[in-house]
Amino acid sequence: MPDVVGAGKTRWAWAVATFFGAGLLRPGPGTYGSVAAVLLWFGAAHWFHAAGVGLAVGTGAAALAATLIGIPAATVVAREVGREDPGFVVIDEVAGQWIALIAVRPDWKHAALALLLFRAFDIWKPWPIRRLERLPEGTGIVLDDVAAGALALALGLAVSRWV
């Protein structure tokens, strides 16, 4: 397990990249990152009584922020550990999961569907998602999950008519 707060580590990047420690949980840190994103989204939706366009805009803004902050954070952490795509970096799952949730009704059935679809696309990585992994450093780490989130959103919207 990585030493998150050890000497020579960039703390802000580790906090963001691991989504405040969710990526340090085992097994399946990516799933923990996605579940944390869904729980935060679900809690915020109900706390702020958000739905419809307001929830979609807020979720999209959160996904954009996670992407824009996540790329440099993932780059820093990957460099510090000397690995291309460390498994404990889960800000990419958070960004992708929030994209998958952009147009989802804030109920458990639709949230679970978005979670399952996103994790399936994130693990499977169909074309062109796999090609995005080849982008350099944090860009490749994050953008493949952003694309997986977009595919999960599209399929989720199609399927949600029957859920």
Question: PLM features: what roles do these ranges have?
Answer:
Residues W41-F42, A63-P72, L101-I102, A114-I123, ...:
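Alpha-helical transmembrane segments of multi-pass membrane proteins
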Residues L25-A44, G58-A66:
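Short Lys/Arg-rich amphipathic alpha-helical segments
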Residues M1-V35, V53, I69-L101, A120-A150:
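Interhelical loop and helix-boundary elements at the membrane-water interface
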Residues D145-R161:
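Final/C-terminal transmembrane alpha-helix of multipass membrane proteins
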Residues M1-P2, G58, A112-A114:
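Active-site-proximal helix-loop elements at catalytic-domain edges
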